[in-house]
Amino acid sequence: MRGFFRWLGIVVASLLALFVIAVGVFVAVFDVHPGRGIGDQSYIVTSRDGLRDEYRLGIGSLDVDLSRMQFPLGVTYLDTRVDVGDLHVVIPPGVAVRGYAEARAGHVNVLGKEDDNWNADVDLTGTGPRVLDLTAHVGAGSIRVERAVR
């Protein structure tokens, strides 16, 4: 019986070691920063003064709703990042979008342009009097950028 518990201990320790190694590899490959936050975060931006330069989340869902914001003439810059999880950005009508959206592993849908799998990305080349220059990155998960319907 003593031999059984010894082998059981070895098996459990081995499985635990494999789990720790797998988590370490995952964190390294997908560049996960839990210090950026874990959970769901939602932002409803109504003015240029209320818009941050960047929105970042470690693990979870990040929603940035710009549908009520009056964009100034020219270019407005926005950098968004979720290490593991989902990123959702809502853009008002009448605002062009340029920039880049990428998911290291996952799905990207930006205003109907889609890509998925490893290194999914969509380039944005919109022009106009009001432009959002968007950088959207997800390590593992999905990006969805859509236009608000008014």
Where are these predicted regions, by residue range?
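Short, surface-exposed interaction patches in beta-rich subdomains
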Residues: 37-57, 61-150
